[in-house]
Amino acid sequence: MSWQNQTDTLGGLPLISVKGLRYGDRAQFQQVADELGHAAREIGFFRICDHGIDLALIESTYQAAARFFALPDATKRRYYIGLSKNHRGYVPFTEKGDYADEVNRSYEAFDLGLDLPDDDPDFLAGNRVLGPNIWPELAGFKETISQYYMQISALGRLVCSALELHLGLPTGAMTDHMTKPVSQLRLLHYVRQSHTKDHSSVNMGAHTDYECLTQIGACAAKG
């Protein structure tokens, strides 16, 4: 079945099974690669299923994030991103982004990345996006989030390897540059909005992402 027929009420975005990237033969890998490439070229967004990430891990990640955001504000601010040398940590509601329509934003975040040791040469050289993460003192938080980061990063590399094939690029043309990625994992907590909310208060201001590939994990729960 072609991806054009695998849509539902979520804005008509294509739903693509990537099982063939993990377990298929060369022909199946090519088919999925072409489906991903076509969706990326024609729409710019697509959804995937059969990604291979344990659903229990995904649920544990949501729970870990919820436990952090439920902490008192003073506790969360101990991990404030402004205290970090490499853009890691808590981003409070009051932090305003460089978006024209983001006057009173209604979300908070926690930013992480590839967890490198504090003696990493790039970190010591002042690289502002590489280095150690800031970890809240919550039981199991580091272990769960670290595992999720590694698995979602591996999925991103797999999708990029498929796009290499679709674009006719040599194997590794993209993925060979991902050995020490600056990939960011952002845990987000959105405040539930009323239908009559003031339009100056937004969940997320209009913006574009700078990454090669953005992966968004959708949660059924409000916020």
Provide a role label for each language-model segment.
Residues 1-223:
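Peripheral, non-catalytic segments flanking oxidoreductase cores
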